[in-house]
Amino acid sequence: MASGGGGCSASERLPPPFPGMDPESEGAAGGSEPEAGDSDTEGEDIFTGAAAASKPQSPKKTTSLFPIKNGSKENGIHEEQDQEPQDLFADATVELSLDSTQNNQKTMPGKTLIPHPTQEATNSPKPQPSYEELEEEEQEDQFDLTVGITDPEKIGDGMNAYVAYKVTTQTSLPMFRSRQFAVKRRFSDFLGLYEKLSEKHSQNGFIVPPPPEKSLIGMTKVKVGKEDSSSAEFLEKRRAALERYLQRIVNHPTMLQDPDVREFLEKEELPRAVGTQALSGAGLLKMFNKATDAVSKMTIKMNESDIWFEEKLQEVECEEQRLRKLHAVVETLVNHRKELALNTALFAKSLAMLGSSEDNTALSRALSQLAEVEEKIEQLHQEQANNDFFLLAELLSDYIRLLAIVRAAFDQRMKTWQRWQDAQATLQKKRESEARLLWANKPDKLQQAKDEITEWESRVTQYERDFERISTVVRKEVTRFEKEKSKDFKNHVIKYLETLLHSQQQLAKYWEAFLPEARAIS
């Protein structure tokens, strides 16, 4: 390394000639002398390699530590046709020998030598990976775990009855006791799992997938009513919603590592979840807390330092409004499709009755065939109504609830910021109080004031770290959520279009088969 003394000349700082170095090379390495008065500057340029590359117009001669060809220029810039580019970093370390350098120049023409990193370059901070890169690294870990919910079973009678679902897990992860296992869970167990996960992870900025909403009317029909089509339809909708909810839970890497999730999937019997009923004391308290948080959120005016969070929150709010409108339209479509199926069935019955009373044999047969076609079309309309609901309406409903959780993550970050600001304000008051005590010359209270200042300084530091940590988590969670949403919508839309295509193909096939019967009418 270059010494700090300004009186040393460049020739005194040159290293001794390398073994095997011919006289011409030695002369080329040490023959040129720097101009007077520029020894310090040129010495620094040689070792850092900055000035020689950035000042091509300078006529000053530079001292090279390696042999160069005769056709090279002396201003630090060399023509590519005449010689290979010089490396001025190579003298920063003694590990590079001349022989190896010359061999590299012979075997790799036209390429710049790669120097060993200097101490300054080694100590320089590495660039932090972006959140997208972190997310891609996270997605490289494939979680081989699939859950399925089947066999809804009504247990008990009357209002004390409940429905138990079979939760089957298939996995190759070593954290579980076996590769496949099954347990029985009721709806309140799913709600209890969400409450536990939300209590632990939501305050840190994580997006905990929400369970399906409660339905007092639907469950009342199941409890006190008979097993009819409406009860079976309600249970199927809830089963599918619970399966999607649980699959989102286990797909989240943080949630999967939670012991409550593993206990939910493996343990035969769980303690009864309390506070999950809508009209219970705990439920009413949660409603009150939500209302209080909504009011407090309106009073917080956050000075956003990162424009990304402000723009992303606006996107989430706008998307939630659009999804709500689209969901309302899709629900109307489902109802119209069901009405169409019902009216098509009535139309088929009327055609069958008309065909049975017709005297013309060909016309009677054609009407009977048309009635059969309409019955098949009624089945197509019913199947498509179910596809409209399960593939489209339920998807929109899920993401409306998920976007509400995303907004809650932004709100939690805002609350963390407000706590940090409140601590800073309190610290400022403590310091002002200490100044007044010093001015009033009250040493008996001064030590207590200093202790309080120390305590609040540590709190401010901790709250600032909490805010930085939750900001990082929220950004990463939103990025992950958007990728999962895109993949989810793509899969569901493709399936939905396939069902529409299949329905139209079947419809065309039915009409093509009926056309000869219509032409045979005489």
UniProtKB/Swiss-Prot annotation:
Cellular component GO terms, alphabetical: cytoplasm; cytosol; dendritic spine; early endosome; early endosome membrane; endosome; endosome membrane; extrinsic component of postsynaptic endosome membrane
Modified sites of kind N6-acetyllysine: K237
Residues modified to Phosphothreonine: T41, T48
Binding annotation for a 1,2-diacyl-sn-glycero-3-phospho-(1D-myo-inositol-3-phosphate): R186, S188, K214, R238
Every BAR domain range: 302-522
PROSITE patterns: PX
GO MF term set: epidermal growth factor receptor binding; identical protein binding; insulin receptor binding; leptin receptor binding; phosphatidylinositol binding; protein heterodimerization activity; protein homodimerization activity; transferrin receptor binding
Residues that bear Phosphoserine: S32, S39, S58, S72, S188, S280
Biased composition annotated in UniProt, kind: Acidic residues: 35-45, 132-142
Region (Disordered): 1-142
Ranges for region Membrane-binding amphipathic helix: 281-298
Topological category with respect to the lipid bilayer: Peripheral membrane protein
Record's keyword terms, sorted: Acetylation, Cell projection, Endosome, Golgi apparatus, Lipid-binding, Membrane, Phosphoprotein, Protein transport, Transport
Pfam families associated with the record: PX, Sorting_nexin, Vps5
Subcellular location(s) per record: Endosome membrane; Golgi apparatus, trans-Golgi network membrane; Early endosome membrane; Cell projection, Lamellipodium
Stored InterPro entries: AH/BAR_dom_sf (IPR027267), PX_dom (IPR001683), PX_dom_sf (IPR036871), PX_SNX1 (IPR034901), SNX1_BAR (IPR028660), Sorting_nexin_N (IPR005329), Vps5_C (IPR015404)
Principal location listed in the UniProt entry: membrane
Annotated GO biological process: early endosome to Golgi transport; endosomal transport; intracellular protein transport; lamellipodium morphogenesis; negative regulation of transforming growth factor beta receptor signaling pathway; neuron projection development; positive regulation of protein catabolic process; receptor internalization
UniProt note: domains: The BAR domain is able to sense membrane curvature upon dimerization. Membrane remodeling seems to implicate insertion of a N-terminal amphipathic helix (AH) in the membrane.
Record note on quaternary structure: Predominantly forms heterodimers with BAR domain-containing sorting nexins SNX5, SNX6 and SNX32; can self-associate to form homodimers. The heterodimers are proposed to self-assemble into helical arrays on the membrane to stabilize and expand local membrane curvature underlying endosomal tubule formation.
Homology family: Belongs to the sorting nexin family.
Protein name: Sorting nexin-1
Organism: Rattus norvegicus (Rat)
The gene coding this protein: Snx1
